[in-house]
Amino acid sequence: MSTRPYTSSVRTAAAAAKRDRVIEAAARSLREDASIASFSLDAVAKAAGVTRLTVYHQFGSRRGLLEAVFDEIARQGGLTAIADAMAMSDPHAALDRLVEIFCAFWNRDPAVGRLHEAMATDPEFAQALIGRNERRRTTVNVLIGRIAGKTASPRARRDAVDLIFALTSFAMFAMLRADRSVDEVCALVKSACHGALGPLLSDASRSGSRPHRPGASRAG
């Protein structure tokens, strides 16, 4: 009887375990090392107990490793809940839920703050994080489209998206968190997001459309 399928599955499992170990070591480096500038394939390989070539084969580059670590931080931080929020029938409730998800995420992992601080000095970190943040902008844009209806002006929609994108950022969370609890920050950001919708809803009403109002989908 051939042992090839068994051997293949063992190798696959071993490779997956090694990959997980590298990601864990990389995430630990981002959380604990004195300087994020020391983050490299060599340093992570040493911490994970593997060769640099192994890390290179698994991730291809420092950027590839960063993306894998970001994916894991996002998974552990609850960003997978965004899909459920976007499936909510009431876009206002979905926006509130989005704020809750990001407040919890920004608060959970010290690596998140350190990564944003590193954007000023490490172009590769900056490029990776800008791409991640643009996903949040895209999500906000979808919700604004649902809330505004079809006739709100492009300017009003853009202003609402930009404001809410800024309000849900790590920089905003960190500034507000200095002397507030996470729940207080979350409530304040929600209120500010509701305020950011005001001009958008007024613009849509003047245009003759019927923008989605809070709780409209639950009206009987």
Identify the residue ranges that each predicted region occupies.
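N-terminal positioning helix adjacent to the helix-turn-helix/winged-helix DNA-binding module
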Residues: 11, 18-25, 156
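Short, basic, alpha-helical segments at the C-terminal edge of helix-turn-helix-like DNA-binding modules
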Residues: 41, 70-78
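Alpha-helical DNA-contacting segments of helix-turn-helix folds
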Residues: 64-73, 113, 132
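Amphipathic alpha-helical packing segments from all-alpha helical-bundle domains
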Residues: 100-115, 124-150, 158-162, 187-198
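Amphipathic C-terminal alpha-helical segment
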Residues: 142, 162-181, 195-203
